Amino acid sequence: MIRQNSYLILILTFKFRAQHSTYKLPVKGGTRYAPNIDLQEVEALATLMTFKLAIADVPFGGAKGGVKIDIRKYSQGEIERATRKYTMELIKKNFIGAQVDCLGPDMGTNEQVMTWIKDTYKNVKGE
C-alpha cells in the first residue's frame, strides 16, 4: 500500500487467503496483517491450521489470510479501507461466509478489524 496526499492507494496491496483443506467445510483460520507476509507463509500457516483443527477434533479445514501492510504506518481510517477492500475481494471470490470460510483474528488484527470484515460482508451479502 502507498499513501498519497492522505489517500490510500490499494493497487499495490498484496492480499492473500489460502484454504488448505476443503474436504471438510467450512474452513477456518486467522487473518494476519504484517509488512513481510507473502503467499508462501500464508499457505504454510493454512496447512498448520488444518493440523491444529484435526488434533483438536474440530471438523473444519484449515485456512489463513494475510494483508501485506505495516499497520504502524497507517491511520485507523486507512486500515479500515484496506480491510473493507480485502473483504470485498474475498466476497468476489467466494472465500468468505459461514458455510465456506470463517475468518478470525491473527497477528496485526483485532476485534475492530473483524467488525469491519463482518459489517462489509453483511452489507454486501445481507447475511
Can you say where each PLM-predicted feature lies in the sequence?
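N-terminal ligand-binding/catalytic initiation module
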Residues: 1-127
